[in-house]
């Protein structure tokens, strides 16, 4: 039997029931949709710490929705089954609700702590945002610094550097004005040198001792200063509030080796002043990163300015060096011109002096061999010795000139070393005998008899050194000793740079000349080897000499890779001259092309040349006559001519010797020699060709030999010298 517990509803109640039906339906739909949404988003979330709470909460919502849905059938008469379902649903909802409420007691504190952590994370996020802002600011500052550094370093012109700095700072920091004050040369004022908006700023100056300037110069970073300070009054007067102003010092680095002319004389601490102004009537202020940017740029400008100063000074030094090089080159050319003029003058004087000397020596030697009374013979010998002394003096001057310009070369040949020493002693002994000096010669047992070197220069050294010993000795003795020097005897402690090296192909000749003469004052040692310098002691003032001997000897010794020095214990205690020269050993060098210049045998001195046909070519009639006289005296059949053309016309195979003056005008002697070779062809059919010259240079000798001449004779020529020349020609076919 059905149970009907409800009374029939009125029409108004039916309307209310419809609204309740609709409300319960939508409540149920909402309750059912919420768990679906929760499940969807929880699955999308990677981390969710309260999944069981979510399950309980979802069950609670679903049961609540179920009660509202079941309630649709309980508003009208219903069966017992519906009542049981409704009761079960409500009981389940109550159980789940209580369990969820109990669980929330434990969860709510965690949820509150989550909120706290959320606030903490928000604070951390804000702090990270600030740090990121600082990093971005630093990166931006670094970018500006790199950009400014690149612009500044792109040039080394300091005006461009400073102008670029102001322009780039103005663009980067959006400045209204930027100015640079440089110290004046006096260093007591700062002068306005560069501004951002004025191409040619008026040179305002302010005292460097102003408090605001001292404040900036004493700080290591940019400093805010008053917009009304003296260095900041660069903007036009307006009613707007002026923007903030900062100033920073720019170190002018001290450069000890460089000084720019239009910069001040820098002290160890000298600064320029850079002033930067923000736009007027703006609320903008200077930030820390902007001030840091200004500091970095100031340091970069200081470095760039130092580089620019170095470059400017280097360019100035380069220009000065170029000017000095031009002046030196001009001086060198003038010196070379002077040397050439001197050499030309000496060459001309040498030739012009030797030509008349040739006549004096030749005629004096002819007179010497004639029948003369003792007084006449003495006068002739005096004339001959004086002429030879004059010739020696000319040779000394020419040799010294060539030694100084490096044109003198050794005439190397094979010679008899023993004969050379004996000849020197034979020349010195007559002078020593007059002064009653005892002269001795000592040659070591291992002393080589034959050597390779310049015999003439070695004899000149010996004659000078031994001659000085005789000249400055009034009594006593002069001893000459020569040894084949060993390593221990080659060292002079006063000349450590002289370090000879022994070899199998060479040996070192050590000559010592000791006398008992006037000695040497220690203060005169530095002047001994200077040209035209002589000992100033009273005992030696009257001694003859030009002061060239030892100077030339030293240069000859140096050419022979040797060393020369003089020792003396003082005035009146004598002196010892020692020299070492390097000579070659025959048989161990390739001396096949070296001439042998040993002395001629004595019987050559007595030879006559009766009937020897000789042709003499000289355009100087006086010199031609003198040469002819010498040859006629020797018994030669002499023909004289004055030109090269005449020589080639007259010269025949009957002529055995052709003597030509090397300085003949017109067809010169070289052309004549070449023509003679062409005319006669074979060597045995042509005459022997000899040049007679007053030029002592090696070039003349080489030119003569190059064109096929057989020898060169240097003026002046005595009868003995002419006899030796002819003997050498006829015996060896050459004379050097």
Swiss-Prot record:
Which positions carry 4-aspartylphosphate?
661
Please name one Pfam family that this protein belongs to: HATPase_c
**Which SMART domains does this chain map to?**
GAF, HATPase_c, HisKA, REC
This entry's comment on the bound cofactor is: Binds 1 copper ion per dimer.
Using the UniProt record, name the top-level EC class of this enzyme in a single word: transferase
Q: Which SUPFAM superfamilies does this entry report, sorted A to Z?
A: ATPase domain of HSP90 chaperone/DNA topoisomerase II/histidine kinase, CheY-like, GAF domain-like, Homodimeric domain of signal transducing histidine kinase
The known PTMs are summarized as: Activation probably requires a transfer of a phosphate group between a His in the transmitter domain and an Asp of the receiver domain.
Task: Indicate what this protein is called per its UniProt record.
Answer: Ethylene receptor 2
Give the gene that encodes this protein.
ETR2
């Amino acid at each position: 039997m059905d149970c009907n517990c409800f009374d029939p509803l009125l029409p108004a109640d039916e309307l209310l029931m419809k609204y309740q039906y609709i409300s319960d339906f939508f409540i149920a739909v909402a309750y059912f949709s919420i768990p679906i949404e929760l499940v969807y988003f929880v699955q999308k979330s990677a981390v969710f710490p309260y999944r069981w709470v979510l399950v309980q909460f979802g069950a609670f919502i679903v049961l609540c929705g179920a009660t509202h849905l079941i309630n649709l059938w309980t508003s009208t008469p219903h069966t017992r089954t519906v009542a049981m379902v409704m009761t079960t649903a409500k009981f389940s909802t109550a159980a789940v609700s209580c369990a969820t409420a109990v669980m929330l007691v434990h969860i709510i504190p965690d949820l509150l702590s989550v909120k706290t952590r959320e606030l903490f994370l928000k604070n951390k996020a804000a702090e990270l945002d600030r740090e990121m802002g600082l990093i971005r600011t630093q990166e931006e500052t670094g970018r500006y610094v790199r950009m400014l550094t690149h612009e500044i370093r792109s040039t080394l012109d300091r005006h461009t550097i400073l102008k670029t700095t102001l322009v780039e700072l103005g663009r980067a920091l959006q400045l209204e004005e930027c100015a640079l004050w440089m110290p004046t040369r006096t260093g007591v004022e700062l002068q306005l040198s560069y501004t951002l908006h004025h191409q040619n700023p008026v040179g305002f100056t302010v005292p460097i001792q102003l408090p605001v300037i001292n404040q900036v110069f004493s700080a290591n970073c940019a400093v805010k200063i008053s917009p009304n300070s003296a260095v900041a009054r660069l903007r036009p007067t307006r009613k707007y509030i002026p923007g903030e102003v900062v100033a920073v010092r720019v170190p002018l680095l001290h450069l000890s080796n460089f000084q720019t002319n239009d910069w001040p004389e820098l002290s160890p601490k000298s600064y320029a002043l850079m002033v930067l102004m923000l736009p007027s009537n703006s609320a903008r202020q200077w930030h820390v990163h902007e001030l840091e940017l200004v500091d970095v740029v100031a340091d970069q400008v200081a470095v760039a300015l130092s580089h620019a100063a170095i470059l400017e000074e280097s360019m100035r030094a380069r220009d000065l060096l170029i000017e000095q090089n031009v002046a030196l080159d001009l001086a060198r050319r003038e010196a070379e011109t002077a040397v050439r003029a001197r050499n030309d003058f000496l060459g001309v004087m040498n030739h012009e002096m030797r030509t008349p000397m040739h006549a004096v020596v030749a005629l004096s030697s002819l007179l010497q061999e004639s029948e003369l009374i003792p007084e006449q013979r003495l006068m002739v010998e005096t004339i001959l010795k004086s002429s030879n002394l004059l010739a020696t003096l000319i040779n000394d001057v020419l040799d010294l000139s060539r030694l100084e310009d490096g044109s003198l070369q050794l005439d190397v040949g094979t010679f008899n070393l023993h004969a050379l020493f004996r000849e020197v002693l034979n020349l010195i002994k007559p002078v020593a005998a007059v002064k009653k000096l005892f002269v001795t010669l000592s040659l070591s047992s291992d002393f080589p008899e034959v050597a390779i070197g310049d015999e003439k220069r070695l004899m000149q050294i010996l004659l000078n050194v031994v001659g000085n010993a005789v000249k400055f000795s009034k009594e006593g003795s002069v001893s000459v000793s020569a040894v084949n020097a060993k390593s221990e005897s080659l060292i002079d402690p006063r000349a450590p740079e002289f370090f000879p090296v022994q070899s199998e192909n060479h040996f070192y000749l050590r000559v010592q000349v000791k006398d008992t003469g006037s000695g040497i004052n220690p203060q005169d040692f530095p002047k001994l080897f200077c040209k035209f310098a002589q000992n100033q002691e009273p005992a030696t003032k009257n001694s003859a000499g030009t002061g060239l001997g030892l100077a030339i000897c030293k240069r000859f010794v140096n050419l022979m890779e040797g060393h020369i020095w003089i020792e003396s214990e003082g005035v009146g205690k004598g002196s010892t001259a020692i020299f070492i020269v390097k000579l070659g050993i025959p048989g161990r060098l390739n001396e096949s092309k070296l001439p042998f210049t040993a002395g001629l045998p004595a019987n050559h001195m007595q030879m006559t040349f009766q009937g020897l046909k000789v042709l003499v070519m000289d355009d100087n009639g006086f010199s031609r006559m003198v040469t002819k006289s010498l040859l006629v005296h020797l018994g030669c059949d002499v023909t004289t001519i004055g030109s090269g053309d005449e020589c080639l016309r007259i010269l025949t195979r009957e002529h055995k010797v052709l003597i030509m003056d090397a300085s003949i005008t017109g067809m010169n002697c070289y052309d004549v020699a070449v023509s003679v070779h062409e005319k006669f062809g074979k060597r045995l059919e042509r005459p022997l060709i000899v040049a007679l010259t007053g030029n002592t240079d090696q070039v003349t000798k080489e030119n003569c030999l190059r064109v096929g001449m057989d020898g060169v004779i240097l003026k002046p020529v005595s009868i003995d010298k002419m006899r030796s020349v002819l003997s050498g020609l006829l015996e060896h076919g050459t004379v050097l």
